[in-house]
Design a protein with these regions (language model features):
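FIC/Doc superfamily catalytic core
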Residues: 1-172
Length: 172
């Protein structure tokens, strides 16, 4: 689907991100598709460690998601940055904004691959971002975290050392 859209030069947009997330979550319950919403009082939306059950990451509030996605879309569609940098930023921002209840990582990997393909840097059958990131999942997650606190509003919205993520991403 994405390769065909890249050939048609479909612009990077919030609608495209939502369409891809719906494909990623095909067969999931309706509440898992689309932007995440408000949590019930007393509940916190967070990414939890599967073993310890501790909150590893607390993304931005649901009400900030539309504006954050709009800013990302505007950046992608107006920047003169190198496509590899744009793809790295798309990946980081989608994982960090965490706009969906589920499928954020898969959607981020697909959308960063879309940016690369659309701008002439596709993999053309020699591998994929999924394979690269799965090769050493621990390093992937550590690079994304960049040693920052778990709370989005405590530095992840504007990381002081993005070169940690760029270095990892650009080694692919």
């Amino acid at each position: 689907v994405l390769e065909e859209k890249a050939k048609q030069n479909v612009p990077f947009s919030k609608e495209l991100i939502l369409e891809i997330q719906a494909l990623v979550e095909k067969g999931a319950s309706e509440e898992k598709i689309g932007l995440r919403g408000e949590m019930p009082p007393g509940f916190l939306f967070a990414v939890y460690d599967s073993e310890s059950g501790e909150a590893e990451y607390i993304p931005p509030e649901y009400c900030d998601i539309p504006e954050l996605l709009d800013e990302l879309v505007e950046y992608v569609n107006t920047t003169d940055d190198h496509p590899l940098i744009v793809a790295a930023i798309v990946h980081y921002q989608l994982v960090t904004i965490h706009p969906f209840e589920d499928g954020n990582g898969r959607t981020a990997r697909l959308m960063s691959g879309y940016v690369l393909t659309q701008r002439g840097y596709g993999f053309h059958g020699i591998g994929s971002l999924e394979e690269y990131f799965a090769y050493d999942a621990d390093e992937y997650y550590q690079s994304l975290q960049m040693g920052l606190p778990a709370l989005y509003y405590s530095g992840r919205e504007n990381p002081p050392h993005p070169e940690i993520w760029f270095d990892y991403f650009l080694r692919m």
